């Protein structure tokens, strides 16, 4: 049982430190994307045959089945 507690604490510490690393990166000025890399913000920007899954354009079969 002590081993499980140790690993749980270790995982929490890793996630906690990762949170601050991510925040620091988000607060820093991020590099701009090249002109050919356009951020997809809505399903209307998806190419034909792809659908919006909330994050990016994917094949409808990639996330329709659970």
From Swiss-Prot:
SUPFAM superfamilies: Invertebrate chitin-binding proteins (SSF57625). Coiled coil: none annotated. One of its GO terms (biological process) is defense response to fungus. Keywords: Antibiotic, Antimicrobial, Chitin-binding, Disulfide bond, Fungicide, Secreted, Signal. It is found in: Secreted. Residues 1-26 form the signal peptide. GO terms for cellular component: extracellular region. Its main location: secreted. The keyword Protein transport does not apply. Disulfide bonds join 46-57. GO terms for molecular function: chitin binding. InterPro entries: Chitin-bd_dom_sf. Transmembrane segments: none annotated. Possesses antifungal activity against phytopathogenic fungi such as P.oryzae, R.solani and B.cinerea but not against phytopathogenic bacteria. Shows weak activity against the insect pathogenic fungus B.bassiana and against S.aureus. Binds chitin. This is Scarabaecin. It comes from Oryctes rhinoceros (Coconut rhinoceros beetle).
